[in-house]
Amino acid sequence: MAERFRGYLPVVVDVETGGFNSATDALLEIAAVTIGMDEKGFLFPEHTYFHRVEPFEGANIEPAALEFTGIKLDHPLRMAVSEESAMTDIFRGVRKALKANGCKRAILVGHNSSFDLGFLNAAVARNDLKRNPFHPFSSFDTATLAGLAYGQTVLARACQSADIDFDGREAHSARYDTEKTAELFCGIVNRWKEMGGWRDFND
């Protein structure tokens, strides 16, 4: 894996939020999927981390955002944790995957990845978290990759074009969207390999 992406480990991330502004709007859910590589050089989704997150103090939450995601903040089974706890757990898992794969840093993979990376970086700054394993500004965007591979930029349509089952009723859950984005990313990279677009020159 370390040689496939120049020492970077792809980690798929999706966030659900209280709006579009990472500085002022609440982070409500975050999920991350680490990516593995088999002995033939093909990628696969490896491990999922998921947390519902308590809005930080003073966070803005737009009613339209809750309506869009279907998140119910007062649901008795929501069992949300603090931003710090959620990020610390995910970072711990990512660092473990980095070590296992011989990679030096994680690179965020997301569908419209700048949005997810912006909220991740804002949570890191708010909580003064050290040892953030993610590259601070580089990312892989599956909206771009899917546009190239399938002519589709919407996640559901891209998955359908890639023959990945996608249930619209489950969409806008960070866990579901992250796992589907991980399948999409692995599928595109693996398809490129099958077409001869990448070879392991150490073979």
Curated annotation (Swiss-Prot):
SMART domains per the UniProt record, alphabetical: EXOIII
Cofactor(s) essential for the protein? Mg(2+)
Per UniProt, Mg(2+) 1 binds at 14
The molecular function GO annotations come to:
3'-5' exonuclease activity; magnesium ion binding; nucleic acid binding; RNA exonuclease activity, producing 5'-phosphomonoesters
Q: Which terms are listed as keywords in the entry? A: Exonuclease, Hydrolase, Magnesium, Metal-binding, Nuclease, tRNA processing
Say yes or no: keyword Metal-binding present. yes
Q: How the cofactor binds, per note?
A: Binds two Mg(2+) per subunit. The active form of the enzyme binds two Mg(2+) ions in its active site. The first Mg(2+) forms only one salt bridge with the protein.
Q: Which GO terms describe its biological process?
A: DNA replication proofreading; tRNA processing
NCBIfam families xrefs: RNaseT
On subunit structure and binding partners, the annotation says:
Homodimer.
What is the role of the protein in this entry? Answer: Trims short 3' overhangs of a variety of RNA species, leaving a one or two nucleotide 3' overhang. Responsible for the end-turnover of tRNA: specifically removes the terminal AMP residue from uncharged tRNA (tRNA-C-C-A). Also appears to be involved in tRNA biosynthesis.
**What is the name of the protein in this document?**
Ribonuclease T
Q: Which organism is it from?
A: Pseudomonas putida (strain ATCC 47054 / DSM 6125 / CFBP 8728 / NCIMB 11950 / KT2440)
